[in-house]
Curated annotation (Swiss-Prot):
Protein purpose: Folate-binding protein involved in regulating the level of ATP-DnaA and in the modification of some tRNAs. It is probably a key factor in regulatory networks that act via tRNA modification, such as initiation of chromosomal replication.
Main location: cytoplasm
Protein name per the record: tRNA-modifying protein YgfZ
Recorded GO CC terms: cytoplasm
Compartments reported by the entry: Cytoplasm
GO molecular function: folic acid binding
Binding-site residues for folate, renumbered to this chain: 27, 189
Alphabetical keyword list: Cytoplasm, Folate-binding, tRNA processing
Family: Belongs to the tRNA-modifying YgfZ family.
One GO biological process term: RNA modification
Pfam families in the record: YgfZ_barrel
HAMAP family linked to this entry: tRNA_modifying_YgfZ
């Protein structure tokens, strides 16, 4: 899709954002169907799939045997089965792991390459959707889905919509080019997810953290009532014995730097720097600002100052 008003490298804060369409090239859609699809997902994912309603999506995780998170995803009913939106960098590995335990199950698991993922946000986003699509989701019905399109509603950090579109709807968006102020790449949506507190797990940080360490309990992305699933024993033990030492934070700094995902985060105490956590995601925002998502030890004080190992820029926790 090519639009003339294209500012792919300009990422803006959510406040006072004009109508913006973001190409979500860093995410993909995985489809699972077959008579055993629900049972298989129930045995693998952290939420209770049996309680997932048709008109909603849920954040959840897929963990390894030791309770460490392979990936996080938004899952929902889709066509004759289920679909989930996941970071593209980890998708192939996660699918392979999910298929490993499906040998004796009647399921099909694959990435869909005939759909298009976009994020719509900013001024009058809801109005734009209502003009072009008959039904749109809201706080009472967070997902609208039919054979051609699916739309997810998000409230944080601003009202926004994730569009799962067919080629037909993609062409419709192209015809509405003049109504869209900005077309950004997926970094705009990534900024929103960071600000909303959704953990970003890419290939570099897969199998590194328990769900508790990336706030998935607080986000209601883990069920303790559904029974067994991979990693459940460790996750439950850490939860009930209060053994988790980490939490998810948003930090901000002036200037632009380019550290690697998984880099070490350091905290200054007195005159020394101490290793305190790890970098999950980074976005460069307009007006010379860098926003990062990090997993940090919960012993920190929010007034502390931080830096990324081998970089001088000072980061502060953003409330």
């Amino acid at each position: 899709m090519s639009l003339s008003k294209c500012f792919k490298n300009s990422i803006y804060p959510s406040i006072n954002l004009p109508l913006t369409l973001s190409l979500l090239e860093e995410w993909c859609l995985i489809y699972i169907c077959g008579i055993d699809s629900k049972k298989h997902l129930q045995n693998q994912f952290t939420i209770d799939i049996n309680c997932l309603k048709k008109e909603e999506y849920k954040l959840c995780a897929h963990c390894n045997f030791n309770g460490k998170v392979w990936a996080t995803m938004f899952i929902f009913h889709y066509k004759k089965g289920f679909a989930y939106i996941i970071r593209k960098s980890i998708a192939k590995i996660q699918i392979k792991e999910l298929k490993k335990y499906a040998i004796f199950s009647k399921v099909e698991i694959r990435e869909l390459d005939d759909i298009y993922l976009f994020g719509l946000s900013g001024f009058n986003a809801k109005f734009f959707l209502s003009k072009n699509f008959v039904d749109i989701p809201n706080k009472n019905c967070s997902l609208i889905s039919n054979q051609d399109r699916t739309i997810l509603w998000f409230s944080e950090p601003c009202e926004r919509f994730l569009l799962v579109l067919s080629l037909k709807d993609l062409l419709l968006l192209k015809r509405k080019e003049n109504e869209i102020t900005l077309l950004n790449n997926s970094k705009q949506w990534l900024l929103f997810d960071i600000e909303a507190g959704f953990p970003i797990i890419d290939k570099q940080t897969s199998q590194k953290f328990l769900p508790q360490s990336i706030n998935l309990i607080l986000l209601q992305a883990v069920s303790f009532d559904k029974g067994c699933y991979y990693g459940q024993e460790t996750i439950a033990r850490v939860f009930y014995k209060n053994l988790n030492k980490y939490s998810l934070y948003l930090l901000s700094s002036k200037g632009n730097i380019n550290p690697k995902i998984g880099s070490i985060i350091e905290m200054k105490k007195e005159e020394k720097w101490y290793r305190i956590g790890f970098l999950l995601a980074i976005v460069h925002v307009e007006f010379n600002r860098t926003v990062i998502q990090a997993v940090l030890n919960k012993s920190i004080n929010i007034q502390n100052i931080f830096r990324i190992y081998e970089f001088k820029n000072i980061f502060l926790i953003k409330n």
